[in-house]
Amino acid sequence: MKIDHIAFAAQSLDQAHAYALQRFGVKLPAGGKHPLMGTHNLVTRIAPGIFLEFIAIDPEAPAPNRTRWFALDRLMQEGKLEDAPLLFGWVASLPGLARNAIESPQHELLEVSRGGLRWHFFHRKDGEAEAGGCLPAMIDWAGGNSPVDNMQDVGLHLNQFQLAHPEMAAIRAKLDGLGWDAACPENRYVAFADAAQPALTLVLDTPNGRVQIEGGGV
């Protein structure tokens, strides 16, 4: 298992565009639409094998018959996305996800599409992050082919993605149980820390210099 992408929840893609331009000095490329969830996104490569995603409710899409992923319904209802996008969590790539995922009353395995892309996605049914964002949702791209290599590099480069939690030993044990490969080049960007509360820290090198963003725990 390895890190696949890091996700921000946004009020809208217009907000995400403005945020990226102000904080990073870049214009984010369009991704596409997710009919199953009624969402759309912006995506950009930030390291070999890793991309950054800003996701928002698609105002042109019909409301889905399920809770949207990345807690977008709750975050919008509570007004937590009014000021700026939130660093929500991350997604890990796990080959064979459809064979190995264990569904439960709290979790579900979905078949998802965006344009010509197809993938399996495993997450909490209520759309919330696991362990304040320290544990990932999981993805398995059809054919094992992540779209990251075809994504535009706009000058955002991942320096570090830190996971902090009061029970970090348990978090790491769960990741190890899922097959976390510490030697994988992508996973070397991920750091672990003890903390009083769950938190995420994303450090990016950007045209505006090095930028540190705090999030998680939402």
Model region roles, listed by residue range:
Residues 1-3, 9-27, 39, 46-218:
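Glyoxalase I/VOC metalloenzyme domain signal
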Residues 27-34:
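Conserved catalytic-core motifs of GNAT/GCN5-like acyltransferases
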